[in-house]
């Protein structure tokens, strides 16, 4: 199963955004499954590719099961892909917002692979599942955690990270940066960041130190998984998490996916790049509204829309 779309010549310059882990909620995608044949086909293909009923966990929970990486990651991806297919099913060509670029936050970068034709839905699902397991194995080998630091200059926080042996793992906005590392290092970094003027420090409820050097054990297995699959050049450029630059070839995307598992997510840089190329409208596709909120804090001129169900798709038609 491959996701495809036509393009139109005029209208606003649109970027698609795809959320990452943390956006999950029990019941997500159920309304799409019940009311859209195209969306239901995505969910069924994901279940078939995994060899188990992920949809049961998505629609019924319990929340603790959905929060597990092996369920949350393919689940968020499935809902985002189902949203795209439901958009195509319900909107005419002149109503369908066509992206000139795409970006996904961490896991969301994998969703972009399927939407831009780099991989089909089945292979994307399998790769996300393998990535999730490799990350979990790395977490078991190198236990750690993450914290959000609000209101501290990036250079100052990078110095805190160096002094405490942790990593800057997500630069979401100028005011919201996430750090990752072992539990002792993160506790020390939170105290030091607060002492140096951070407005707020928040311990995150996560299963590991994602996007840090503690994820290095996942790289070898991820390389092997990626090389076993048939990658294609994207039909729409994907902005890389690690560099904020556009990816236009299969080889560059493979390199990015390997680097991303232990590298910093440069979300602010990615948004700055997209707006610099003329993007004025962002559509966050999938559960949650975190990415749109970040984009708005990065640049208030940005127009934000969210697609998570049929009602939000119909709003695109009216707008």
Where do the protein language model's features map onto the residues?
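Conserved functional loop/turn residues at catalytic and ligand-binding sites
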Residues: 106, 230, 278
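Short glycine-rich catalytic loops that host catalytic nucleophiles or stabilize transition states
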Residues: 203-206, 275, 308
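Non-catalytic positions within long, well-ordered alpha-helices that form the structural scaffold/packing
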Residues: 194, 275-278
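FabD-like malonyl-/acyl-CoA
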Residues: 2-156, 281-314
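Short amphipathic alpha-helix with an adjacent loop that forms part of the alpha/beta core around
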Residues: 315-319
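Alpha/beta catalytic cores of group-transfer enzymes, especially the acyltransferase/condensing modules
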Residues: 21-23, 50, 115-264
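Short hydrophobic/charged patches on amphipathic alpha-helices used for structural packing
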Residues: 268-272
């Amino acid at each position: 199963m491959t996701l495809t779309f036509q393009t139109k010549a005029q209208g606003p310059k649109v970027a698609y955004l795809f959320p990452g882990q943390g956006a999950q909620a029990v019941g997500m995608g159920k309304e799409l499954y019940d009311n859209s044949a195209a969306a239901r086909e995505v969910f069924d293909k994901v279940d078939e590719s995994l060899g188990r009923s992920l949809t049961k966990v998505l629609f019924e929970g319990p929340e603790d099961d959905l929060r597990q990486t092996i369920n949350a990651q393919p689940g968020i991806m499935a809902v985002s892909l189902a949203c795209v297919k439901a958009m195509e099913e319900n909107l005419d060509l002149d109503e369908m917002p066509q992206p000139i670029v795409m970006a996904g936050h961490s896991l969301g970068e994998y969703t972009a692979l399927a939407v831009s034709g780099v991989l089909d839905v089945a292979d994307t699902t399998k790769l996300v599942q393998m990535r999730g397991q490799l990350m979990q194995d790395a977490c078991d080998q190198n236990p750690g955690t993450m914290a959000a630091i609000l209101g501290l200059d990036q250079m100052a926080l990078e110095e805190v990270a160096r002094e405490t042996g942790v990593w800057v793992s997500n630069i979401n906005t100028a005011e919201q940066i996430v750090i990752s590392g072992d539990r002792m290092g993160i506790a020390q970094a939170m105290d030091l960041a607060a002492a140096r003027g951070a407005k707020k420090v928040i311990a995150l409820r996560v299963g590991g130190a994602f996007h840090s050097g503690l994820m290095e054990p996942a790289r070898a297995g991820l390389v092997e998984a990626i090389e076993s699959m048939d990658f294609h050049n994207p039909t729409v450029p994907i902005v890389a998490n690690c560099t904020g630059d556009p990816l236009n070839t299969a080889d560059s995307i493979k390199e990015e996916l390997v680097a991303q598992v232990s590298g910093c997510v440069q979300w602010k840089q990615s948004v700055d790049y997209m707006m610099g190329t003329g993007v004025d409208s962002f559509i966050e596709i999938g559960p949650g509204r975190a990415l749109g909120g970040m984009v708005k804090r990065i640049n208030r001129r940005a127009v934000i829309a969210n697609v998570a169900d049929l009602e939000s798709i119909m709003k695109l038609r009216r707008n």
